[in-house]
């Protein structure tokens, strides 16, 4: 089979022919329909400082946002059968640590990531734990299924710990409208937010945010986001702030435009320490600060399925580019250009379910 491989600890990747892997006990072999490019994949492709410190096995096949058809099942697999169309949860949990045993497998102490710690999905076939294969029902386009994993990140951040009830009829601010931020705009709109405010310096992504349902678009290059949000909310601020950028200045602004008693979900990863006014902007506000990683397994997947299968969120505008796998260099260049949102690649000739 063809697979995109990180063949050496240096920038770039190679398209190679490698054997089709066999599923072991508790595993399934998935014939990949589509895989989308994530920021993690860009790091690995560029072989930046993060990748050098995180990726421990080279050569390897990378890529982790994926959907496809189960081609074969290993021993002791009972809940998923050959021919099922699945999306894949990329957090591979141990199942036995204290966090797994208390229902928080997405923050497993021994967590492994598909396409980082194991061979991934930029290939014609990929082996994954059967428990990580989420059966995609009718009503979800196969291409959309390939981005259910990052869409789930946005679902987790937007729903928070209260099932999204704090969004209903309230103003919501999304800071950073990359793909996950754009997804969050659509989710907040679907959950009944009174006003969805998108804060994003990139002109094209602000336009996409409007297509996803944003009511107010703020360019932080020309307008003060704190003043703009306070003006739009009668001085109250946003009841929910979804911070997707990881930018230190934006995170600080997020606490300042957050309403008293409001909730701020942090998903964007800053490059280093961030300075915040904890006294006035967090403690005295009784702000709820919620760190977000991955997806709750598998509550988030059910929420994701409902939003997509019912059409409550249309993610078509976010998928801006499609490439066959043999044009991977162009695909990665496009994903890193700032002129794309979600880029998906197709390893096989047949792009239909």
Put a short name on every predicted segment.
Residues 138-222, 227:
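Mid-domain Rossmann-like dinucleotide-binding core that forms the NAD(H)/NADP(H) cofactor-binding site
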Residues 1, 31, 240, 252-256, ...:
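C-terminal hydrophobic helical "lid"/dimerization subdomain
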Residues 215, 247-310, 347-353:
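Glycine-rich phosphate-binding loop and adjacent beta-alpha segment
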Residues 64, 92-175:
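NAD(P)H dinucleotide-binding glycine-rich loop of Rossmann-like/cofactor-binding domains
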Residues 21-35, 50-98, 137-139:
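Glycine-rich beta-strand-centered segment in the early N-terminal region that forms part
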Residues 3-22, 39-72, 87, 108-119:
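N-terminal glycine-rich cofactor-binding segment
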Residues 236-242:
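Short SAM/SAH-binding signature in class I
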């Amino acid at each position: 089979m063809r697979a995109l491989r990180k063949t050496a600890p240096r920038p770039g990747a190679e398209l190679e022919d490698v054997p089709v892997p066999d599923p072991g006990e508790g595993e399934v072999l998935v014939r990949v329909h589509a895989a989308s490019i994530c920021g993690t994949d860009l790091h690995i492709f560029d072989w930046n400082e993060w990748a050098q410190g995180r990726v421990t096995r080279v050569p390897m096949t990378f890529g982790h946002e994926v959907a496809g058809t189960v081609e074969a099942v290993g021993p002791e697999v009972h809940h998923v059968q050959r021919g099922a169309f699945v999306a894949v949860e990329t957090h591979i949990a141990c199942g036995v640590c204290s966090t797994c045993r208390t229902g928080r497998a997405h923050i497993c102490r021994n967590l492994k990531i598909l396409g980082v710690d194991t061979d991934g999905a930029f290939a014609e076939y990929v082996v994954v734990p059967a428990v990580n294969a989420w059966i995609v029902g009718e009503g979800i386009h196969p291409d959309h299924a390939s981005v259910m994993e990052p869409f789930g990140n946005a679902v987790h951040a937007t729903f928070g710990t209260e099932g999204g009830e704090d969004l209903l009829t309230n103003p919501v601010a999304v800071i950073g409208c990359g793909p996950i931020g754009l997804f969050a705009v659509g989710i907040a709109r679907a959950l009944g937010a009174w006003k969805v405010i998108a804060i994003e310096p990139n002109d094209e992504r602000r336009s996409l945010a409007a297509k996803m349902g944003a009511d107010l678009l703020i360019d932080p290059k020309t307008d003060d986001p704190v003043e703009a949000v306070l003006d739009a909310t009668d001085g109250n601020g946003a009841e929910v702030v979804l911070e997707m950028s990881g930018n230190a200045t934006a995170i600080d602004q997020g606490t300042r435009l957050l309403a008293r008693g409001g909730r701020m979900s942090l998903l964007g990863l800053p490059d280093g320490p961030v300075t915040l006014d904890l006294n006035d902007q967090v403690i005295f506000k009784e702000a709820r600060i919620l760190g977000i990683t991955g997806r709750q397994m598998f509550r988030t997947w059910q929420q994701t399925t409902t939003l997509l299968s019912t059409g409550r969120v249309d993610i078509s505008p976010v998928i801006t580019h499609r490439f066959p796998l043999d044009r991977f260099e162009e695909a990665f260049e496009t994903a890193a250009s700032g002129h794309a949102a979600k880029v998906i690649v197709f390893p096989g000739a047949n792009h239909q379910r």
